[in-house]
């Protein structure tokens, strides 16, 4: 338990219990794990609230209906995708620099389908994320949900989705919860690896993001997936198909 906590101080007793079962084949009930954590003074790191919500584009070229309508359950991979962009900061001396992460999340297995990291929050950031997802999942035609950020309301982006055979869906104005699984992933990433740290180079920040997404997809178990990782959930579906 101390090893799990030392490797990931963000984990509370419930996630420690899940890791014991998943990674070490040790079955123990939550109350016992909680008692041991208290005796060893094991506490999860402070949880920060994620307040991110993209502002609507000033002059949207295309707005889709909220076709997802908070129906976040999916029966198979590539049935429903969500996407968003989030911002990070790093410091070089007294200068503050920004970095932007665009990602696509699958609502069936909660895996990160694709992501792109760039210095600017612009159309290519989002367009390239979609292109990477299509390349990694040929033939996929998911319902594609986003907020009303300027990239997603761009006519070129709409045409890219249409060419790929994807139906577009958008959150209602100012309704962050319409995109809550994606917003939730940002919160998880930032709570577990970003908040409370000061990054002093671009490379350090990029390495953190890339390594975390690999960890999230391949090693981080989730209770809503049946104490499986996103990749395990994805592979189980493929084996059963």
Locations of regions flagged by a protein language model:
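Mobile genetic element proteins and their domesticated derivatives, centered on retroelements
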Residues: 1, 16, 33, 37, ...
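Basic, flexible linker segments flanking DNA-binding modules
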Residues: 1-76, 175, 229-238
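Conserved, non-catalytic sequence blocks in retroelement Pol enzymes and Pol-derived host proteins
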Residues: 9-10, 25, 72-73, 91, ...
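RNase H-like polynucleotidyl transferase catalytic core
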Residues: 46-52, 144-148, 162-181, 197-200
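An active-site-proximal beta-strand-loop segment
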Residues: 70, 74-113, 119
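Active-site beta-loop-alpha junctions of metal-dependent nucleic acid enzymes
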Residues: 97, 116-137
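Acidic/histidine-rich, metal-coordinating catalytic segments
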Residues: 139-154, 172, 228-231
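C-terminal domain-tail junction helix/linker
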Residues: 162-166, 188-241
């Amino acid at each position: 338990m101390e090893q799990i906590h030392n490797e990931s101080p963000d984990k509370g007793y419930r996630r420690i219990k899940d890791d014991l079962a998943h990674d070490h084949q040790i079955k123990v009930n939550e109350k016992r794990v909680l008692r041991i954590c208290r005796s060893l003074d094991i506490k999860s790191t402070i949880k920060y609230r994620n307040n991110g919500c993209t502002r609507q584009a000033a002059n949207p070229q295309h707005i889709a209906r909220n076709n997802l309508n908070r129906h976040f359950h999916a029966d198979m991979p590539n049935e429903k995708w969500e996407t968003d962009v989030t911002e990070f900061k790093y410091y070089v001396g007294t200068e503050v620099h920004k970095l932007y992460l665009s990602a696509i999340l699958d609502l069936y297995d909660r895996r990160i389908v694709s992501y792109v990291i760039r210095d600017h929050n612009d159309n290519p950031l989002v367009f390239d994320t979609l292109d990477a997802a299509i390349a990694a999942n040929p033939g996929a035609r998911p319902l594609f949900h986003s907020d009303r950020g300027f990239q997603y309301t761009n006519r070129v982006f709409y045409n890219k989705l249409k060419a790929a055979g994807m139906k577009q869906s958008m959150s209602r104005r100012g309704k962050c919860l319409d995109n809550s699984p994606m917003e939730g992933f940002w919160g998880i990433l930032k709570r577990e690896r970003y908040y409370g740290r000061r990054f002093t180079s671009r490379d350090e920040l990029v390495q953190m993001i890339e390594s975390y997404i690999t960890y999230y997809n391949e090693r981080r178990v989730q209770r809503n997936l049946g104490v499986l990782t996103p990749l395990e959930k994805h592979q189980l579906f493929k084996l059963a198909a």
